[in-house]
Regions:
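Membrane-interface extramembranous regions
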Residues: 1-133
């Protein structure tokens, strides 16, 4: 197993785990959903489904490259909720909230996650992508 596969499996397992948490502890995630989106429960469940699917894609070798692109896209799409949490000092379902430093660390980790996801997808900036998988 190479290092890229190891990162994909670990990242995929993390996405599946967090996705399952969206079903088992829905109330914990609901405060992060910006009110203008409507039903927080819907968005928590929907994002949980997507996180599980993306995680599975990262784990299965034949579609791992798609999982890399999907996880990068997911991390980009979910960041506005994290930004909402940061700007509005939102408390999670257990009453905890991140400090300014914690939110900054989260941003750096999210950017790193996007980079690793694109690396897993074997994406190279400026190169035409061929589906050789």
């Amino acid at each position: 197993m190479n290092i890229r596969a190891l990162f994909a499996i670990l990242g995929g397992s993390f996405f599946v785990y967090v996705g399952v948490l969206h079903f088992t502890d829905t109330e914990w995630f609901e405060p992060i959903v910006p009110p203008f989106l409507g039903s927080a429960e819907f968005w928590v469940i929907a994002s949980g489904v997507v996180e599980i699917l993306v995680g599975v894609m990262l784990i299965i070798p034949s579609i791992r490259w798609m999982g890399g692109f999907a996880s990068a896209t997911l991390l980009i799409c979910l960041y506005p909720a994290n930004l909402y949490m940061w700007v509005n000092s939102v408390e999670l379902g257990d009453g905890a909230s991140l400090s300014q430093t914690g939110n900054l660390v989260r941003l750096v980790l999210q950017l790193g996650g996007i980079w690793i996801s694109l690396w897993i997808a074997e994406y190279e900036i400026g190169k035409v992508q061929k589906n050789s998988h």
